[in-house]
Amino acid sequence: MSARAVALAALRRIEGDGAYANLVLGPALERSGLDDADRRFATELVYGTTRMRRACDALVDRFVATPPDPATRTLLRLGAYQLGFAGVPAHAAVGETVALAPKRVRGFVNAVLRRVASTPMVWPSEWTRLSYPDWIGERLVAELGEADAIAALETMNLAPPVTVRDDGYVQDASSQWVAAAVEVAAGERVLDACAAPGGKSTALAAAGATVVAGDARPARARLVAANAARLGLGVATVAADATRPPFPDGTFDAVLVDAPCSGVGA
């Protein structure tokens, strides 16, 4: 299976079933047999196409009179991302993506992607170009001014650097700062109320705290437990709504609430 085929299958799960990108892509890569370079390419295609979805649709919709079915739409997005944002040569982006299309739509996909490749884009708005909803751009303009708002969104579209803790756990630097801000002492009891996937909980446990990690979804709580076990750390987990914590007052010395993000992909 090619990197593009793995990416397409993952994108269809994400877009069709509302699945989490990271939970879909990891197992898909493990099953794929791809080498490291192709794994990186598949990862870039999945996260990049998801991140730039609005912009990819704008690139495609100039040449589409009737909305395509969801599976074809996903394939067109994948091709448009390669052409518009991934720096893939046009012949490869078009040819390899068309090869993934069912015969009944292969000519359509080929025609649309060739036009995307050959036609300069005039973006209808900065928010379309940056692939954010209008309301996010407008709110940031109100708070920061237009130039700083655009700069902020451009920065958020950049792939973050990979940061690895001393114990080998891959965790964004900003998440590491959140855990460090708790300043726990050894033996203190800490509740990490919105814990999945477990990076902050395991960092607190590694610092000597007794940690209870909670998440509203049982599957997400199990993910915390799995990550803690992999690191050899004792973290108790509970599936619980942090707005109604099942603990009496005074149970913990500290409570960390790194509340769930907005889900905008930034």
Identify the function of each model-found stretch.
Residues M1-A266:
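S-adenosylmethionine
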